[in-house]
Every structure is written in C-alpha cells, then in structure tokens.
C-alpha cells in the first residue's frame, strides 16, 4: 500500500466511528443547551418566582429598550458565551407587595444560573477516577443518570417549590456536564484515527454551539419560552440524555483503554476492527504498545504528581493556559454588551440578532472542523487569538466614540461578529481536545480533570467579577481583554505545540525532549514550544 492509500485508509470514516463520536458529543450538546436555555425564559421564570414567594412584580422587562424605564444590568455568575446573551439581568425592583425583598429574587435567579457552573467545578475533579474505574463508555452511561434526574426536576418545577427544584436541577445537570466535558474528549480522542483526531475533536464545540442555538430558538415566546411551557423548555435536554444512554449501548469501548489500562489485547483488536472497518489495526496496536510501555514506566499519575513532576510540568502549564485563554478572552463581555449595541444600531428585536450571532457561531464552528486538520491546531489557535485582539480594539473604539458618531454602532456590530468568528476558529474548539492530545495514557485522565476544573472555575470567576470590571472601566473594559489576549497570544506562540498528525507518544516525547528516530523528529519540527521549554 503506497503513502497516499495509507493516508486515505487512515481518514476512512466507518459507521461505527461516526455513531460513537456522534453519541459521545451528545454530552456536549446537553452542555450547550444548558448554558443557553436559562436566558430566554428569564422574565417569565422571575415572574413565577415572584408569585411563588408572595411578591407581585410590576411590568418591568429584562431587556428594556426605553430610556425612561432603563434596565440596570448585572452579571449572572456562571455566564457562558457561545452565542448566548445570558449574563444580563434586570433587578427585580419595584414590587407592589414588599413581602419579599427584590434582592432575594435576584439571589434566587443568580443561583438558578450559577449552580450549573458550581456543579461542573465539583464533578470535574472526578473525571479521571470514574473514567479509569468504569471505562469510557460505561462511565458516560452512568453519568447520564445525573442529566436525566436534573432535567426531570426542572421539567416538573411547577409541581413544587420552583426555585428550589430549578436550582437543584441546574446543580445536578452541572455535575453531569462537568463529568461529560472530561469523558467525551477523552473517548473521542482515543477512538479517532490520528488523521481525523483534530476534525472529530472539533465536533465538541459544534455540539455546544448547536445546543445553545436550539435553546435560543425554542426559548422564543411563541414556542416554549412562555409562562405555560418554560418547565418543558428547561427539561428538554433530558431527551438528548435518554438518546445518548441507549446509543451508548451500541458503542465500542475505547481500544486504548482496553489495551493499555486493562491489558485486554483481543478485545482491543475487536474494538479497533469495529471502528476502522477493514483497515489493518496492527499499526495502531504497535503505537498502543509503545504507549503502554511508557505508561508502565510512569504508572498511574495522580493530580498531585501531575504538578510535582517536572516531566509533566510544561504540558500542564500549556493545558491550563489554553483553558484560561478560552474563558478570559472576553467572549462573555462581548455578549454582555451585544444586546445594547444591537438596540442602538436600530435592531427592533435584539433577541433575533443574538440568535443571528448564534447562527454565525454554528456556521464557523462547522468551518473549523475542516480547517483544523489542514491548518493545524497551533496555527488556528494563534490566528483566533490575534483576530479576537484586533476585534477587541475595534470594539473599544466603537464604544468610546458611539456617543459622538452614531455609525460607530455598526463598527461595534461588525466587531462582535468578527470576535465570535475568530473565537470559533481557534480558542473556542481547540482547548477541548488539545489537552487529551498533550498527554499519554498515564497522566491523561488527571490532566483532563485539572483542565476541566480550570475551565469551569474561570467560567465562574468571569461571571462573578465582570460586572465590577465593567463598572470600573466602562467602555474601556475591552482594553483589559485586549491585554489578556496579547499575553495569551505570546504564550501560545512560544509554548503551545503543534499536535496535528502526531501520535500521543510523539507529542509526549516532545515535552520530555526525548530523541525520537529521525523520521519522527522531522515530523516534530513544528513543536518549537515543547523543544524550547
């Protein structure tokens, strides 16, 4: 078989591989849906909370366009920003019956949003343990119970104390998503052939933005975002959980887990044959054997060892920084201002403009699926950060000069769309799967757990702190993010390796400065960051 034929064989998609990846990323679809769904029915849920708690809210809208009845906005902890305007909340002020403080209602709403991120933070540390203990497929099966339970509580919210049921349901769903955000990249990276690992890994982000977009559309008033149907809207993600549960029964276990962790050679070969079809599995078996030998020498790696061992230090720093750059890039801030900017630009229904941003979000995530294996992870990550930096500067100029030149609102609108586009090109999808690529089998579960916790924690911090930064800096708030983006760009240029087309062993070896055969070293020339570290 010549080189071209081998490459085509390595890029061959079988039905089992497609089913396995689709089933796994349903976990990220639920993640995206849960991020976006709480935003659309905000007004009706707040009103319901008010009735439940004995307060009668006056007519006051969460996204008020009138200057005489302006809305003061606060940031909701746990805000996420893939196409969602979640994060702006009208204080529940002005109640005819003051039996309940408006601050209490604000607190309950804040908890309804933020407990999702808290749940994710708590569970993310157990990803490595449950993934190794149960196996990748069985672990995803078991944690689906959390999603089903959480969505059931929210779907039945009107039948009990709604605020308690929603807060509990969001927390339990967050527990599921924290586990899923680690297990899914782990499984997808391990079942994907090297030539397709980047493209298939990008599907995580596509599932997230699709979930957000669908939740935004279904949350429109004339669909499910009304006083009668909002519990159904909140609990609808449980359908995806049920679908994933039954489809997982048809998916093969990760051959890498079977071979390296359990030593089940024949079962690993059977799993590979199901995933690869008629392709000869011996090349991948040989790669696994090398990785198994490395894993045997390093044994099981705990989170403490991950940080204390100089062997993993560079890879850990890179893994954490790509997660931090995703959350601290300013994407949340962009969507914090987007509704107001759309209004000032003359858009009559800002919610539809936000959905339009969600559509752009989804389209460019699809494009990134095809770009990631052609341009490489490192190149796209750098391009995305630089594009976001330029867009942040343009956004600052637009906001500062908006009061002097009305047409600057259009500059701001263009900057929003460009910011989102560049985010989806690199910093959006790449952190989710590059962490799994940076580590060999031994430290991979611990590394994914730490990176997942970092992502969730940064998500929560941004939600908690952004309002104070915005109040302090005003329209110059994006200067802060521009500086951060510059720091992230310089770090990525110096330290983030190219993982395109590399085996796990080759990537790990680059961080260890291990000398590989001449051919492998030629393939690793782009790993400048790992070699210079």
Curated annotation (Swiss-Prot):
Membrane-protein topology: Multi-pass membrane protein
Annotated transmembrane regions: 18-38, 111-131, 137-157, 164-184, 200-220, 230-250, 316-336, 351-371, 380-400, 414-434, 446-466, 472-492
Record CDD domains: MFS_GLUT_Class1
Glycosites: 64, 69
Extracellular topological segments: 39-110, 158-163, 221-229, 337-350, 401-413, 467-471
Entry GO CC: brush border; plasma membrane
Keyword Nuclease annotated: no
Pfam families (alphabetical): Sugar_tr
Swiss-Prot/TrEMBL catalytic activity: D-glucose(out) = D-glucose(in); D-fructose(out) = D-fructose(in); L-dehydroascorbate(out) = L-dehydroascorbate(in); D-galactose(in) = D-galactose(out)
Any one biological process term the GO annotation gives: dehydroascorbic acid transport
Keywords: Cell membrane, Glycoprotein, Membrane, Sugar transport, Transmembrane, Transmembrane helix, Transport
Cytoplasmic side: 1-17, 132-136, 185-199, 251-315, 372-379, 435-445, 493-533
Main location, first listed in the record: membrane
UniProt subcellular location: Cell membrane
Residues the entry annotates as binding D-glucose: 205, 326-327, 332, 361, 424, 432
InterPro entries in the record: Glc_transpt_2, GLUT, MFS_dom, MFS_sugar_transport-like, MFS_trans_sf, Sugar/inositol_transpt, Sugar_transporter_CS
Activation and inhibition: D-glucose and maltose competitively inhibit fructose transport. D-glucose, D-fructose and maltose inhibit deoxyglucose transport.
Single GO molecular function: D-glucose transmembrane transporter activity
Similarity-based family: Belongs to the major facilitator superfamily. Sugar transporter (TC 2.A.1.1) family. Glucose transporter subfamily.
NCBIfam families attached to this UniProt entry: SP (TIGR00879)
Function according to Swiss-Prot or TrEMBL: Facilitative hexose transporter that mediates the transport of glucose, fructose and galactose. Likely mediates the bidirectional transfer of glucose across the plasma membrane of hepatocytes and is responsible for uptake of glucose by the beta cells.
PANTHER family: SOLUTE CARRIER FAMILY 2 (PTHR23503), SOLUTE CARRIER FAMILY 2, FACILITATED GLUCOSE TRANSPORTER MEMBER 2 (PTHR23503:SF27)
Name of this chain's protein: Solute carrier family 2, facilitated glucose transporter member 2
Organism: Gallus gallus
Name of the gene encoding the protein in the UniProt record: SLC2A2
């Amino acid at each position: 078989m010549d080189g071209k034929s081998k490459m085509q064989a390595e890029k061959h998609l079988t039905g089992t591989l497609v089913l396995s990846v689709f089933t796994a990323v349903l976990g990220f679809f639920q993640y995206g849906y849960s991020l976006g769904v709480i935003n659309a029915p905000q007004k009706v849920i707040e009103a319901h909370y008010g009735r439940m708690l004995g307060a009668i809210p006056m007519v006051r809208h969460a996204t008020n366009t009138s200057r005489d009845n302006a809305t003061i906005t606060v940031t909701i902890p746990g805000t996420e920003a893939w196409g969602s305007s979640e994060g702006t909340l009208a204080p529940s002020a002005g109640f005819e019956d003051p039996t309940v403080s408006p601050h209490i209602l604000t607190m309950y709403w804040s908890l309804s949003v933020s407990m999702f991120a808290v749940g994710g933070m708590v569970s993310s540390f157990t990803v490595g343990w449950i993934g190794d203990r149960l196996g990748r497929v069985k672990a995803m099966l078991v944690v689906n119970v959390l999603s089903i339970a959480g969505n059931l509580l929210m779907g039945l919210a009107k039948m009990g104390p709604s605020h308690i049921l929603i807060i509990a349901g969001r927390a339990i769903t967050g527990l599921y998503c924290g586990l899923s955000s680690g297990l899914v990249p782990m499984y997808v990276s391990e079942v994907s052939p090297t030539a397709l690992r980047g493209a298939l890994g990008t599907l995580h982000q596509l599932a997230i933005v699709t979930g957000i977009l669908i939740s935004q559309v279904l949350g429109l008033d004339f669909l499910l975002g009304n006083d009668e149907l909002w519990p159904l809207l909140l609990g609808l993600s449980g359908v995806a959980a049920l679908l994933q549960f039954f489809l997982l029964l048809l998916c093969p276990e990760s051959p890498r887990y079977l071979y390296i962790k359990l030593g089940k050679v024949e079962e690993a070969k059977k799993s590979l044959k199901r995933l690869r079809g008629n392709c000869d599995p011996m090349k991948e078996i040989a790669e696994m054997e090398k990785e198994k030998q490395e894993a045997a020498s390093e044994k099981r790696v705990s989170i403490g060892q991950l940080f204390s061992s100089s062997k993993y230090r560079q890879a850990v720093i890179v893994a954490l920084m790509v997660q931090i750059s995703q959350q601290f890039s300013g994407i949340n801030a962009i969507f914090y201002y987007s509704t107001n900017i759309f209004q000032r630009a003359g858009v009559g229904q800002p919610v539809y403009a936000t959905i339009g941003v969600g559509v752009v979000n989804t389209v460019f995530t699809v494009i990134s699926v095809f770009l990631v294996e052609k341009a490489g992870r490192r190149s796209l990550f750098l391009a995305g950060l630089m594009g976001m930096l330029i867009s942040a500067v343009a956004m600052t100029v637009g906001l500062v000069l908006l009061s002097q030149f009305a047409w600057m609102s259009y500059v701001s609108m263009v900057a929003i769309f460009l910011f989102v586009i560049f985010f989806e090109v690199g910093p959006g999808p790449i952190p989710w799967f590059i962490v799994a690529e940076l580590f060999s089998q031994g430290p991979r579960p611990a590394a994914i757990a730490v990176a997942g916790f970092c992502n969730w924690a940064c998500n929560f911090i941004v939600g908690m702190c952004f309002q104070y930064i915005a109040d302090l800096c005003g329209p110059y708030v994006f200067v802060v993010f521009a500086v951060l983006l510059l720091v992230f760009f310089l770090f990525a240029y110096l330290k983030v390796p190219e993982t395109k087309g590399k085996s796990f062993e080759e990537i790990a070896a680059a961080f260890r400065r291990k000398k590989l055969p001449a051919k492998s070293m030629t393939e690793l020339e782009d790993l400048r960051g790992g070699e210079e570290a």
